[in-house]
């Protein structure tokens, strides 16, 4: 076993060696390096063929038409294109958008920007299991609502929204539905022939593909119109200009093709690893699982260790790569906005760690990590006066702290 151990697969995944090989074949002078938009010679034709093959591979994982896949630089850009593209195109129809308080910052910050432009956004409060229900959405739908944007799987707590039921609701009301599927692609089955979803964001680097490439599914039936946010040579049917990076696209396509073949077996293996880890740490007192106990992906285990400061715990686990909150916001010492929205108090939100398991995680690594977590939590609690008070039966929430 090699140290340090990587248990932060929800932040990013390493590129699968099979993917890296396919990408390398598109870089050098002997490889497929041409510009896919070059129509006048074989180098361009071969590159375009590789791009279209990648488009087909992405479409096959989610059962969509390849023509519904638009290449972007990642899920952040896909989210921006979906929200701004819909808002700007359909603003004469209405200016109301619905999302939730626990979305990724790529959706929340885009929604804030649209508010500055005069759109009205309703931010739903999920249940404490991290799930937004169809009833919650229905309660705030209005005649001028043009878009509902919700994630499929939450990046911090791994809970799964029932996007099938929410899609039925939005479609029946004539409201567009955007789903951020960055954390669900390759983990949860997605069938866009059945789901009533109009737009869906994807990222390659959460699925063992390269960083810097993603896609946006844009439905053709019913047809969804978008106003572009990046202008130029009119690539991607005018929705997203810019020379297509053949090697990145080939990488994303191969990563999604592997996910399609191996998802079922991989999910079972990762569930076994996650259960094995949880079983070993579950003897710790005052341990809380964040998010849904049932509707969740096995890859993500977000735990709060009461009376332990999360940052201290992270520092104590120096050979184990885990995170508190999402990678995009984990540099701040603020407690996770997601856990706060789920109703966790500051103390529990501050004591949370996200463990995420993946394709290259081994049983040996899981056992080592569980042992180190137990040792660190017990040691930090020994040093904590709050833990002593809790063990003595003092209700800490009732204490009036006096300022010196």
From Swiss-Prot:
Instruction: Work out whether the entry's keyword set contains Metal-binding.
Output: yes
Active site at which residues?
Answer: 328 (cysteine persulfide intermediate)
Cellular compartment(s): Cytoplasm
Associated pathway: Cofactor biosynthesis; iron-sulfur cluster biosynthesis
**Known cofactor(s):** pyridoxal 5'-phosphate
All disulfide bonds of the chain are none
Q: Could you say which residues bind pyridoxal 5'-phosphate here? A: 75-76, 155, 183, 203-205, 243
Name the UniProt key words of this record, in alphabetical order.
2Fe-2S, Cytoplasm, Iron, Iron-sulfur, Metal-binding, Pyridoxal phosphate, Transferase
**Single GO cellular component annotation?**
L-cysteine desulfurase complex
* Annotated catalysed reactions: (sulfur carrier)-H + L-cysteine = (sulfur carrier)-SH + L-alanine
What Enzyme Commission number(s) appear in the record?
2.8.1.7
Q: Which GO terms describe its biological process?
A: [2Fe-2S] cluster assembly
User: Mostly located where?
Assistant: cytoplasm
- Residues bearing PTM N6-(pyridoxal phosphate)lysine: 206
| Pfam families listed in its UniProt record | Aminotran_5
The GO terms describing molecular function are: 2 iron, 2 sulfur cluster binding; cysteine desulfurase activity; metal ion binding; pyridoxal phosphate binding
Family annotation (InterPro entries): Aminotrans_V_dom, Aminotrans_V_PyrdxlP_BS, Cys_deSase_IscS, Cysteine_dSase, PyrdxlP-dep_Trfase, PyrdxlP-dep_Trfase_major, PyrdxlP-dep_Trfase_small
In which residues is [2Fe-2S] cluster bound?
A: 328
The record's comment on protein family reads: Belongs to the class-V pyridoxal-phosphate-dependent aminotransferase family. NifS/IscS subfamily.
Q: How does it assemble?
A: Homodimer. Forms a heterotetramer with IscU, interacts with other sulfur acceptors.
Q: What is this protein called?
A: Cysteine desulfurase IscS
The scientific name of the source species is: Pseudomonas putida (strain ATCC 47054 / DSM 6125 / CFBP 8728 / NCIMB 11950 / KT2440)
This chain is encoded by the gene named iscS
């Amino acid at each position: 076993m090699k140290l340090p151990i990587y248990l932060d697969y929800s932040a990013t995944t390493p590129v699968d060696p099979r993917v890296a090989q396919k990408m390398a074949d598109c870089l050098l002078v002997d490889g497929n390096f041409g510009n896919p938009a070059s129509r006048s010679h074989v180098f361009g034709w071969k590159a375009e063929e590789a791009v279209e093959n990648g488009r087909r591979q992405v479409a096959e994982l989610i059962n969509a038409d390849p023509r519904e896949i638009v290449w972007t630089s990642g899920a952040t850009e896909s989210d921006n294109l979906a929200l701004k593209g819909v808002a700007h195109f359909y603003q004469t129809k209405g200016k109301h958008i619905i999302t939730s308080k626990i979305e990724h910052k790529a959706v929340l910050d885009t929604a804030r920007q649209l508010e500055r432009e005069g759109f009205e956004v309703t931010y739903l409060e999920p249940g404490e299991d991290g799930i937004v229900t169809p009833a919650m959405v229905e309660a705030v739908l209005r005649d001028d609502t043009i878009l509902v944007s919700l994630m499929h799987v939450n990046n911090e707590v791994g809970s799964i929204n029932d996007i099938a039921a929410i899609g039925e609701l939005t479609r029946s009301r004539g409201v567009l539905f955007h789903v951020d599927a960055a954390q669900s692609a390759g983990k949860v089955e997605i069938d866009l022939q059945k789901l009533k979803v109009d737009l869906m964001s994807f990222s390659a680097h959460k699925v063992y593909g390269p960083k810097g490439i993603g896609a946006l599914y844009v439905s053709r039936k019913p047809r969804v119109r978008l106003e572009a946010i990046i202008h130029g040579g009119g690539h991607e049917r005018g929705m997203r200009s810019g020379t297509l990076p053949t090697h990145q696209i080939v990488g994303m396509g191969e990563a999604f093709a592997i996910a399609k073949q191996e998802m079922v077996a991989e999910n079972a293996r990762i569930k076994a690893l996650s259960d094995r880890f949880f079983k070993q740490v579950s003897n710790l007192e005052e341990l809380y699982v964040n998010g849904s106990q049932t509707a969740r992906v096995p890859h993500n285990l977000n735990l709060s260790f009461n009376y332990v400061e999360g940052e201290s715990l992270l520092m104590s686990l120096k050979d184990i790569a885990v995170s508190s909150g999402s990678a995009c916001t984990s540099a701040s010492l603020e407690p996770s906005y997601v856990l706060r929205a789920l109703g966790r108090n500051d103390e529990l939100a501050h004591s949370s760690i996200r463990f995420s398991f993946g394709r290259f995680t081994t049983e040996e690594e899981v056992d080592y990590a569980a042992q180190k977590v137990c040792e660190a939590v017990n040691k930090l609690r020994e040093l904590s006066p709050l833990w002593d008070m809790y063990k003595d039966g003092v209700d800490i929430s009732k204490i009036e702290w006096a300022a010196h």
